[in-house]
Amino acid sequence: DEGKNNYLMSVVCMSDRYGISAADITTGDCYVTEVDKERKLLDEINKFSPAEIICNDAFFMSGIDMEDLRHRLHISVSALDSWYFGDEMCHQTLQEHFKVSSLEGLGLKDYEIGIIAAGAMFRYLLETQKNALVHMNKVTPYTTEKYMVIDSSSRRNLELVETLREKQK
């Protein structure tokens, strides 16, 4: 859809927490967060409405309804090989991409699982995109507690994303 963000989301399930990174490679927008409940994860998925989710195997085994994501929300979901989610590799991928010696300056100090999600996503993008990712020059960490969550039904009824009749923005 022209004029609509086209997000790729990376989800990592680890230690009963979820690391989330979402990026739109056309605009360069990139976000990182962590949540501790399935409901909050689903809220984030609904908020970004990604075209694709890449994830680790633990996410597939976490009990999330993959068929619901695939069919009702029309999201492609695929698990990547475990090496994508290696802690050291993810840190290194982000440090090289953003040309920093530490991720602290990017505001990611308190987002260990989010760093893994973002690192795996950037590694995946580097391997699958024909173009350089130079326009993706910042990452925005955020906490869900600082924002009011509007569920998908309310978002649709309030026509925040598109109109109900014409499906226009």
Which ranges hold each PLM region?
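Charged catalytic and DNA/RNA-contacting regions of genome-maintenance
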Residues: D1-K169
